[in-house]
Amino acid sequence: MTSKIIVALDYEKEAEALALVDQIDPSLCRLKVGKEMFTTLGINFVKQLHQRNFDVFLDLKYHDIPNTVARAVRSAADLGVWMVDLHASGGLRMMEEAKKILEPYGKDAPLLIAVTVLTSMEDLDLLQIGINASPMEQVLRLAHLTQRAGLDGVVCSPQEVEILRNTCGKEFKLVTPGIRPIGTDFGDQRRVMTPTAAIRAGSDYLVIGRPITQADNPAEVLRSINVSIG
């Protein structure tokens, strides 16, 4: 699997999600399962995606006391997901314990990444929760904390990719939502970029939802994006 595209499955019903999944090629993308779908459909839905040969990014953004998060991450590893995430704002100890609990899994451990600043958040949003910093400043602070904890990478907006690549190195994975091909609606994302521009900036993986899932021909859109990013 070499594709850099992660298709975000944001559906209310299993049948609708699987109808989309059955139209696309697992060699051309991975799939992201978030809070809504996982809460509704649970681990059996993830298993169905695995049976269709898709790698799964379990996007539950864990944020709790260290022991609780570590155990949740272990459960994700037992499920066999490819990637799982947590909130870097949970702190260094929380992230370190989550990383440590994956050690027995060796090469079969999922990638463990941290969410820095949600791509819907702007300066005012941060100020309202007591953070007197720009999104960029907060992303850098949390990315460095994530790297110190030994995690594999972070979720960040495309605009932060270049500086994170320069400061965190080539091996640190950068996963970027807020990806919108030219001509598509921005939706509720505020810090966005096209797939080609994001890859050029240094993104490792692009999270793309509605431009693919709501397309008349999802398979063709997916193929086209893969071609555009090489």
From Swiss-Prot:
GO aspect biological process, one term: 'de novo' UMP biosynthetic process
UniProt keywords, alphabetically: Decarboxylase, Lyase, Pyrimidine biosynthesis
Keyword Manganese: no
Catalytic site: 61
Classification via CDD domains: OMP_decarboxylase_like (cd04725)
Listed EC numbers: 4.1.1.23
Enzyme class, broadest EC rank: lyase
Cited Pfam families: OMPdecase
Catalytic activities: orotidine 5'-phosphate + H(+) = UMP + CO2
Chain positions recorded as substrate binding sites: 10, 32, 59-68, 119, 180, 189, 209-210
Keyword Lyase part of the UniProt annotation: yes
GO terms, molecular function: orotidine-5'-phosphate decarboxylase activity
GO cellular component, as recorded: cytosol
Subunit structure, as described in the record: Homodimer.
HAMAP family listed in its UniProt record: OMPdecase_type1_B
Purpose: Catalyzes the decarboxylation of orotidine 5'-monophosphate (OMP) to uridine 5'-monophosphate (UMP).
Protein name (database record): Orotidine 5'-phosphate decarboxylase
